[in-house]
Amino acid sequence: DLAAKLNALGEELRFVLLTSGANVADYAQAPADAWQSDLLKGLKVVLSKAEGEKCPRCWHYTSDVGKVAEHAEICGRCVSNVAGDGEQRKFA
């Protein structure tokens, strides 16, 4: 089913969708005002503004921008990519 395929991407779903975050929820639990796809049966979409600050390096909105003193202007993910071993991605 579609939800299982999307959930298989895990945290990388947000990269596939080019967004700061993404969640897959049960179709039946979608609010009445959710957008419903005419092309993909079983797909409803709800959009909301991302929380946190925009990282100037990756442009993702996240709550950990500035948490690392040595790299106070970027998010934790970017710190890992710039000063650490970097993130390991499987899909995107």
Swiss-Prot record:
GO terms for biological process: tRNA aminoacylation for protein translation. It catalyses: tRNA(Ile) + L-isoleucine + ATP = L-isoleucyl-tRNA(Ile) + AMP + diphosphate. The keyword Nuclease does not apply. InterPro entries: tRNAsynth_Ia_anticodon-bd (IPR009080), Znf_FPG/IleRS (IPR010663). Binds 1 zinc ion per subunit. The lineage of its organism: Bacteria, Pseudomonadati, Pseudomonadota, Gammaproteobacteria, Enterobacterales. It comes from the Bacteria. Monomer. GO terms for molecular function: ATP binding; isoleucine-tRNA ligase activity; metal ion binding. This is Isoleucine--tRNA ligase. Zn(2+) binds at C55, C58, C75, C78. IleRS has two distinct active sites: one for aminoacylation and one for editing. The misactivated valine is translocated from the active site to the editing site, which sterically excludes the correctly activated isoleucine. The single editing site contains two valyl binding pockets, one specific for each substrate (Val-AMP or Val-tRNA(Ile)). Catalyzes the attachment of isoleucine to tRNA(Ile). As IleRS can inadvertently accommodate and process structurally similar amino acids such as valine, to avoid such errors it has two additional distinct tRNA(Ile)-dependent editing activities. One activity is designated as 'pretransfer' editing and involves the hydrolysis of activated Val-AMP. The other activity is designated 'posttransfer' editing and involves deacylation of mischarged Val-tRNA(Ile). It comes from Klebsiella aerogenes. Belongs to the class-I aminoacyl-tRNA synthetase family. IleS type 1 subfamily.
